[in-house]
């Protein structure tokens, strides 16, 4: 693997949109993403396997979190300055890309922001981020608000949890194969269903709490995978889950993906945004 002289250092080109011409900004985004794809830098512990290419901009709340050249995690836009992602994705700062579809091309819909403020759940075990998955939820506050367009829109939160059997959708730029890494250029989607909590507990004995939920289409082996962490599980038009963890290799029969159950954190999310 070719090694860069150093991680991609964001210089004056990383100022907020408007500080540079649109063309220069677009080139910067392309360079950032291209470096990540070429070097294979994909972050996040979790596991879209056997999905399909999303219709362009059909998931306008989808966010890509980068750290320098590294595709760190997915995230979900929930307010003009706020993202929701997994706590195990936490870093000191992020480059945030919104309005993306094909990471090798620009279509004028892209927006970029920076963020240095993260608010992981206070009960998340940061000393064991890849082993203890309880309370794997975090808010990220961007340095400036985004502009809502057809390609950039927030996703609704709901205090009501969904029932087993509900059809949902997951999305991300994570690897499309496992255990080998194969990174897609375009955003991938997969249709999954919520699984009974007892079945989830049987799949991962002793590791499932009431703030987690499982989803998959086990007959077809669909699942989220590396690089998808922090991304959305969308059910009935609302954010019901955050991609958190699962079996490695991904999409193994009888081993569903595990998600943070967002409805259980509805009050906490709004409290953090209100106080910050």
From Swiss-Prot:
SMART domains: Tryp_SPc (SM00020). Pfam families: Trypsin. SUPFAM superfamilies: Trypsin-like serine proteases (SSF50494). Disulfide bonds join 54-189, 73-89, 168-235, 200-214, 225-250. Gene3D superfamilies: Trypsin-like serine proteases (2.40.10.10). Its main location: secreted. Residues 45-47 form a propeptide. Its EC number is 3.4.21.-. InterPro entries: Peptidase_S1_PA, Peptidase_S1_PA_chymotrypsin, Peptidase_S1A, Trypsin_dom, TRYPSIN_HIS, TRYPSIN_SER. CDD domains: Tryp_SPc (cd00190). Residues 48-274 form the Peptidase S1 domain. One of its GO terms (cellular component) is extracellular region. It is an enzyme of class 3 (hydrolase). Keywords: Disulfide bond, Glycoprotein, Hydrolase, Protease, Secreted, Serine protease, Signal, Zymogen. One of its GO terms (molecular function) is serine-type endopeptidase activity. Expressed in brain and prostate (isoform 1) and prostate (isoform 2). One of its GO terms (biological process) is proteolysis. The keyword Nuclease does not apply. It is found in: Secreted. This is Kallikrein-11. It comes from Mus musculus.
């Amino acid at each position: 693997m070719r090694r860069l002289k150093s991680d991609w250092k964001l210089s004056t080109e990383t100022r907020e949109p408007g500080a540079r011409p649109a063309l220069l900004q677009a080139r910067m985004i392309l360079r950032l993403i291209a470096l990540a794809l070429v070097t294979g830098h994909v972050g996040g512990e979790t596991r879209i396997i056997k999905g399909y290419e999303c219709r362009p901009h059909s998931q306008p709340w989808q966010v890509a979190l980068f750290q320098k050249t590294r595709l760190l995690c997915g995230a979900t836009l929930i307010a003009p300055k706020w993202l929701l992602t997994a706590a195990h994705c936490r870093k000191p700062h992020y480059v945030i890309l919104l309005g993306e579809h094909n990471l090798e091309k620009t279509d004028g819909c892209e927006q970029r922001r920076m963020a240095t403020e993260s608010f992981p759940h206070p009960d998340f075990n940061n000393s064991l981020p890849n082993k203890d998955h309880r309370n794997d939820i975090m808010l990220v506050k961007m340095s400036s608000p985004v502009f809502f367009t057809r390609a950039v829109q927030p996703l609704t939160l709901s205090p009501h949890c969904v029932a087993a059997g509900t059809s949902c959708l997951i999305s991300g730029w994570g690897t499309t194969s496992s255990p080998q890494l194969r990174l897609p250029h375009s955003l991938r989607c997969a249709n999954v269903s919520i699984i009974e909590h007892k079945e989830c507990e049987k799949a991962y004995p002793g590791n499932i709490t009431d703030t987690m939920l499982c989803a998959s289409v086990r007959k077809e082996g669909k699942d989220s995978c590396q690089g998808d962490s922090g991304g959305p599980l969308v059910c009935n038009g609302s954010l019901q889950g955050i991609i958190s963890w699962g079996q490695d290799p991904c999409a193994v029969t009888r081993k569903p993906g595990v998600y943070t159950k967002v409805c259980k954190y509805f009050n906490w999310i709004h409290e953090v945004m209100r106080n910050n």
